[in-house]
C-alpha cells in the first residue's frame, strides 16, 4: 500500500495511504513542534495549546466542534509529545471533508478566549495532579528532569501549576506564529481515501497557511545524568535508571532498540527472567530506548519493596555488565523478530498508520518502507550490539529517579563504581 505525497506551494505536505478493505478514514494534522520548543517561561504551553485549540474558533464554539464530528459518528482528539503535536479525527469516508475543515478551522481560527483559558487551566491542573499522584508516571518525569537537567526536553510536557498560571491568550498566538506554518506540518489521511480529493480539500482550507516563519532552532539536547528521589509512604519503590542513548537520525538507533529488547523487552528477556522469575525481586521490570532528533535515552524501569531496592539495582547492573560481554545468536534473532513484528502490528490500523506516516515525513523528509527498516535491522551483528552497549553503559553518567521508600537509594557515584567493577 503506497503512500502518495503532494506538497502545496506553502510547503504543507499532504500524504495519503489508501487501504482497500478499510471502511473509515483517519485524518490529521501533525506539527513538528512540541514541549522542547518551549522557552523556560512557556513550560507547558504546547500541551495547553492543544487543549485550547478545541475551545472555540471564529465560527465554532467548543461544543460545536465536538458535536459536528460526533453527529456523523466520528471522533476527534489531539496529543502533544516532546517534538510533535497532532490533531486528528477518525471518521467515515463521506465525512472526510468535514473532518479536514474542522481540523483546519481549529488550527487557523482559534479565538483563545480568556474565560475558556482560565477554565482549561483548572482542567490541566487536574491532569497534572493525577500524574503527580501516580508513582509510575511521575518517576518518568523525574527521570527526564535529571537526565536532561534544566532543558526543555527534560521538563514535563504538562507543565506545572506555577507555569500554567502565567499563560495569556497572546502567548498561544505567538507560539503558533513561530511553529505552525506550512513547511513544519504534514496533513495525512489513511484508509478509504482518494488522494486527489483529499489534496483538493486540504488545499481549499489550508492553502493560505503561511509557508515559513523565522526558523527557531532548538538548542541541542545535552545529556547530563544524576540522581533524584521523591520519598513517599508507599509499599513499593518505583525506579527508572538510564544512560544516554541514540538519536533516531543515526543508524545506531536500531541497534539500541535491539539492545533494549534483549535486556528487557518481554517475558523472555534477561531482566524479566533473571530478576523477576528467578529471584522474585520485582513484579514489573522492562528496558526501553527513546530516540529524539538530536539525542536519546536508554532506560530500565522497575518496582520493588523497600527491602529489595538495593539488591534490585545491583542485580540490574550485573545484567548490564553481562550484556556487554555475552549476547547469543538466539537472543539477537528473537529481538529482530520482536522488533519486526512490533512494526508490522503497529501498522494494522489507520489510526496507527496516519501518525506514523506524518512523523516519518516530519522526521526524515520521506517514508521509510518496512523493507528498508528491516534491512537495517537484519544487518545488525552481535559485535555491533556489544560495541554500542559499551558506549551506552560505560561512557555516560547514570541517571536514576525513584519514588516511594527510597531515602537510601544508591548515588550515581556508587552506580558508576558498581559498573566499573
What kind of feature is each model-predicted range?
Residues 226:
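Flexible, small-/acidic-enriched active-site or ligand-binding loops
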Residues 268:
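Functionally critical, cavity-lining and gating residues within the transmembrane helices
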Residues 11, 18-69, 180, 241, ...:
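Active/ligand-binding-proximal structured segments within catalytic/core domains
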Amino acid at each position: 500500500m503506497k503512500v502518495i505525497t503532494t506538497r502545496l506551494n506553502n510547503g504543507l505536505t499532504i500524504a495519503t495511504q489508501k487501504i482497500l478493505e478499510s471502511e473509515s478514514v483517519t485524518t490529521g494534522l501533525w506539527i513538528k513542534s512540541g514541549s522542547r520548543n518551549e522557552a523556560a517561561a512557556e513550560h507547558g504551553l504546547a500541551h495547553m495549546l492543544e487543549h485550547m485549540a478545541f475551545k472555540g474558533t471564529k465560527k465554532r464554539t467548543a461544543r460545536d466542534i465536538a458535536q459536528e464530528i460526533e453527529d456523523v459518528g466520528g471522533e476527534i482528539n489531539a496529543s502533544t509529545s516532546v517534538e510533535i503535536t497532532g490533531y486528528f479525527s477518525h471518521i467515515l469516508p463521506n465525512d472526510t471533508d468535514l473532518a479536514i475543515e474542522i481540523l483546519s478551522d481549529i488550527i487557523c481560527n482559534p479565538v483563545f478566549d480568556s474565560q475558556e483559558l482560565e477554565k482549561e487551566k483548572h482542567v490541566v491542573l487536574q491532569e497534572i495532579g493525577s500524574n503527580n499522584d501516580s508513582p509510575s508516571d511521575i518517576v518518568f518525569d523525574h527521570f527526564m528532569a535529571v537526565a536532561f537537567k534544566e532543558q526543555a526536553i527534560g521538563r514535563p510536557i504538562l507543565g506545572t501549576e506555577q507555569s500554567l498560571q502565567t499563560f495569556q491568550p497572546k502567548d498561544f498566538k505567538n507560539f503558533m506564529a513561530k511553529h505552525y506554518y506550512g513547511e513544519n506540518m504534514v496533513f495525512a489521511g489513511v484508509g478509504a481515501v482518494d488522494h486527489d480529493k483529499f489534496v483538493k480539500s486540504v488545499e481549499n482550507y489550508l492553502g493560505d497557511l503561511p509557508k515559513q516563519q523565522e526558523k527557531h532552532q532548538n538548542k541541542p539536547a545535552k545529556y547530563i545524568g544524576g540522581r533524584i528521589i521523591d520519598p513517599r509512604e508507599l509499599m513499593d519503590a518505583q525506579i527508572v535508571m538510564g544512560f544516554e542513548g541514540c538519536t533516531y537520525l543515526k543508524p545506531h538507533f536500531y541497534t539500541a532498540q535491539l539492545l533494549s529488547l534483549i535486556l528487557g523487552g518481554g517475558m523472555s528477556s534477561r531482566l524479566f527472567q533473571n530478576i523477576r522469575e528467578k529471584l522474585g525481586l520485582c513484579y514489573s521490570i522492562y528496558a526501553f530506548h527513546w530516540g529524539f532528533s538530536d539525542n536519546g535515552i536508554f532506560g530500565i524501569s522497575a518496582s520493588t519493596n523497600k527491602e529489595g531496592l538495593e539488591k534490585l539495582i545491583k542485580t540490574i547492573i550485573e545484567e548490564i555488565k553481562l550484556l556487554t560481554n555475552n549476547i547469543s545468536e538466539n537472543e539477537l534473532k528473537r529481538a529482530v523478530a520482536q522488533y519486526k513484528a512490533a512494526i508490522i502490528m503497529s501498522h494494522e490500523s489507520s489510526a496507527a498508520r496516519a501518525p506514523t506516516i506524518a512523523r516519518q515525513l516530519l522526521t526524515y523528509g520521506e517514508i521509510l518502507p518496512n523493507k528498508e527498516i528491516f534491512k537495517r535491522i537484519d544487518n545488525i551483528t552481535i559485535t555491533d550490539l556489544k560495541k554500542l552497549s559499551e558506549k551506552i553503559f560505560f561512557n555516560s553518567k547514570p541517571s536514576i529517579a525513584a519514588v516511594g521508600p527510597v531515602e537510601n537509594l544508591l548515588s550515581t557515584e556508587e552506580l558508576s563504581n558498581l559498573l566499573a567493577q
